[in-house]
Amino acid sequence: MGQALGCIQVDQSNVAIKETFGKFDEVLEPGCHCLPWCLGSQVAGHLSLRVQQLDVRCETKTKDNVFVTVVASIQYRALAESAQDAFYKLSNTRNQIQAYVFDVIRASVPKLDLDSTFEQKNDIAKTVETELEKAMSHYGYEIVQTLIVDIEPDVHVKRAMNEINAASRMREAASEKAEAEKILQIKRAEGEAESKYLSGMGIARQRQAIVDGLRNSVLAFSESVPGTSSKDVMDMVLVTQYFDTLKEIGASSKSNSVFIPHGPGAVRDIASQIRDGLLQGNSAAE
């Protein structure tokens, strides 16, 4: 109705392209405008100045021959001061942007291996944005921001990557477990060594106490019973220890059966053997 009366409304964040007899005349700002249609004035079309978003999926191959799908998100808008170029120079803005994105991604990703592609996705996005900005500025468009939102490897490659990561985790866990067992064994060995050391110290003190006791017993008996020699006292002590040993073996419930001579003559022989062994040991030491 308004156009029939020669008036037109342009909404906010939009501009209208005015033509006179098919030739560009001016860009109409938001508001109400009079168009004398009888003089050949008309609106050729409207152009939105809002930020628009285009998601582009580009399949390409990395340097290590892995096929990936790179998903790029392009945010762009038409410039009000270049509305004429934006309206007339491009017939399909989205297809044009998509073509530039394909070109830049397929030129950048094949230079990188798969891991580097993930690590340098911000650099790829910056390269795409720079190239798009140079190209689209000639057509009256501004590239607001470019994001690489996803990098999708082939399904089989993704499964293999997950298996590699799982194997790496298991290897680390096994290494940590082995290290823990190693530390445990070291600590156990240190504990056993300390235990044996303390046990040895106890045995040494026990034997020293026995030697001291025997020496005192021999001296006391020799002084109490005149006419006895040290040899007689040692024979008696050895016989006493012999019977004490038999008593301990018989008293223990876990002892094995031990068959040894235990008559008086056998005791004398054992005492003689022990005494001779001590004398030989002393001679060897001297």
Swiss-Prot record:
GO cellular component, one term: plasma membrane
Its membrane topology: Lipid-anchor
Assembly with partners or alone: Self-interacts and forms heteromers. Interacts with AHK2. Interacts with NB-LRR class of R proteins (e.g. RPS2 or RPM1) before R proteins are activated by the effectors.
Keyword set includes Repeat: no
Cellular localization per UniProt: Cell membrane
Coiled coil: 156-190
Protein name: Hypersensitive-induced response protein 2
PANTHER family: HYPERSENSITIVE-INDUCED RESPONSE PROTEIN 2, STOMATIN-LIKE PROTEIN 2, MITOCHONDRIAL
A Gene Ontology molecular function term of the record: protein histidine kinase binding
Residues covalently joined to lipid (N-myristoyl glycine): G2
The entry's keywords: Cell membrane, Coiled coil, Lipoprotein, Membrane, Myristate
Lineage: Eukaryota, Viridiplantae, Streptophyta, Embryophyta, Tracheophyta
Species: Arabidopsis thaliana
